[in-house]
Amino acid sequence: YFDNQLVFVDGYGQIKLFDVTNGTEIWSTSIEYPILSPPLIYRGYINFITADNRIFSVDILNGEINWSFQTISETKKNLFTSSPVAFENTIIAPFSNGELVAFIFDTGQPVWSENVSKISMISNFDIKDISASPVIYENSIYSLSSNGKLVSVSAINGQRNWAIDMSGYRTPVISGNQLYIINEDGKLICLDKNSSEVYWITDLLKYRKGQKAENLNLWLGPYLINNLIYNISYFGELKIVSPITGDILSTDTIGINGVLTPPVILSHSFYLSDENSNVYEFK
């Protein structure tokens, strides 16, 4: 959404721009590649990543391609990828081979790159994708890969600040000097964003029961709301955690099942959708 205009992209390669006041389609175009990431609108351009590990920059005025760049493609990847992010005059893209690459926003000139994924000398079959959206705080970028590392790098030149072994799919959240993140084992971790020192770890439980795939909790979060950390499972379980101590303050069931997409959070309510496309409001 930008300036009363709504950008639509999909897995068929369609890109459309609508006027939100009356629903009129302003322009429509398409590319031959499925679009896997949400779009980023920045300084007059729409940026997104496609299934062949390519980033596109499209002019929001007319839908014409401004530039594109392709890095090494990966056959093993997640169904969706995270969105590019913007920092000053650069667009930073997370690719499915574990690379973060920064580009000049209007020319597509690469500025720097950093690999977030752990390099395996044994297997080429690991998923290296970056499913968690990179987070920019001050002059640093924090990024988590599906197989390998949580890293902090300079948004200016890509120089690595620190890295720790951790894998996951959920976007971290930062408050003050603390970074909160859920790893692939369903553990909520609080660490120092400057040094990577771990303050506490809380086990949200990877499985609802047993260890079968159908019982994976697939936690969404963390979400910092009113100075509390909210975490929501696929089965509709809500766990509220203290950001200071990591203690689980409450566990409740919100009454819906099949929660896969992150909520939309407003000032006094949040909205969730389930795998059947039903939308729910919670206050």
Where is each model-derived feature located?
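Short loop/turn segments that connect beta-strands within beta-propeller blades
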Residues: 19-23, 59-63, 104-108, 154-157, ...
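Post-signal-peptide, soluble extracytosolic/periplasmic N-terminal scaffold domains
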Residues: 1-11, 17-19, 28-29
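C-terminal closing repeat unit and adjoining cap/tail of repeat-based domains
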Residues: 195, 228, 233-277, 283
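Loop/turn-rich, solvent-exposed surfaces of beta-rich toroidal or solenoidal domains
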Residues: 178-193, 197, 201-240
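Extracytoplasmic beta-rich repeat domains
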Residues: 1-3, 25-43, 65-88, 110-138, ...
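Structural signature of WD-repeat beta-propellers
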Residues: 3, 10-11, 50-51, 95-96, ...
